[in-house]
Amino acid sequence: GAVIAEVRIRGIRVRIVAMHLDLSGLWRRRQARAIISALEARRPLPTILMGDLNEWSLHGGCLRAFAAGFAQVPLEPSFHSRRPLARLDRIMVSPHFRVMASGVHRSATARVASDHLPVWADLELTDAHV
């Protein structure tokens, strides 16, 4: 599923989508298409997508649905927290953003808090923002 929020950052409206997609590849692809449809039904805004996509592929599967309008933020593996091998947790941004920095939080506390390590990105709105 997904949650969509619109917030104002320094007077600029930004859309944020938090997702936790299904374990099934078929359902993940359906969920991704539903999220894209929901976004297309709204006015265009600078948009950040993020969450546990449960997608093991680097660019395939449900990620294809997002690729036309969103760039993946470069991230290291964040799953499983004790021995990260997979990039299941993603951040994707519309062309309105420039990625200044990104990473995976690897503290001892993070390793026991969840089976996923937290991911983060420092983003800057470009001059092309809406």
Could you describe each region identified by the protein language model?
Residues 1-130:
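Active-site regions of metal-assisted phosphoester/phosphodiester hydrolases
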